[in-house]
């Protein structure tokens, strides 16, 4: 309400209604608003984004990360956000359909994109702590473990750039 640029550490909120209230307030008070997992700005994620077209037409992919469905901080919204945002950063936001299956504390979802590409999203509750992304194209494939050492500084720079330029790094629709 004070018009101060705002960064909400992931997730933006754990209910769609709360997300809409925050976005509406930002619009009403003409203030910048963003929220993201800094993993989307890790060097390895950016590198795969830059090289994705070299793989030809995207056919399939995998995004994997830890998740605690029972977390006191909003269940899967707290930690699962990392693997989801990594997927969206690399493969885009044009998701058509999502189906999933939960077994114990692990969930595997199949994310169908408008292009027809299928992405397996692995939200793992009892596997070794790791973030990983794979892209399969018609001309090649690439598997990328994600190192967290660059993401925090890169994510901070994105927020500073938002304040400097007055342009949000993600649209309101992408925040949802």
What are these regions (language model features)?
Residues 3-5, 9-11, 166-167:
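Alpha-helical hinge/cap motifs
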Residues 20, 42, 81-85, 153-157, ...:
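A structural signal for well-ordered alpha-helical segments within the folded catalytic domains
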Residues 127-167:
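Interdomain hinge/lid region at the active-site interface
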Residues 7, 12-73, 83:
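A contiguous active-site-proximal alpha/beta segment in oxidoreductase catalytic domains
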Residues 62-129, 173-176:
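Rossmann-like dinucleotide-binding domain that binds NAD(P)(H)
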């Amino acid at each position: 309400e004070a018009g101060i640029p705002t960064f909400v550490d992931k997730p933006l909120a754990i209910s769609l209604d709360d997300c809409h209230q925050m976005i509406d307030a930002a619009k009403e008070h003409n203030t910048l608003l963003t929220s993201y997992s800094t993993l989307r700005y890790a060097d390895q994620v950016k590198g795969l984004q830059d090289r994705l077209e070299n793989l030809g037409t995207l056919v399939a992919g995998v995004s994997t990360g830890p998740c605690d469905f029972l977390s006191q901080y909003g269940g899967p919204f707290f930690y699962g956000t990392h693997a989801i945002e990594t997927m969206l950063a690399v493969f885009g936001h044009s998701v058509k359909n999502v189906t999933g299956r939960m077994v114990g504390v692990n969930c595997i979802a199949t994310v169908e994109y408008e292009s027809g590409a299928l992405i397996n999203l692995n939200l793992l509750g009892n596997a070794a702590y790791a973030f990983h992304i794979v892209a399969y194209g018609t001309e090649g494939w690439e598997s990328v473990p994600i190192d967290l050492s660059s993401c925090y500084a890169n994510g901070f720079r994105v927020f500073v750039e938002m304040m400097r330029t007055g342009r949000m790094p993600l649209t309101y629709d992408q925040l949802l």
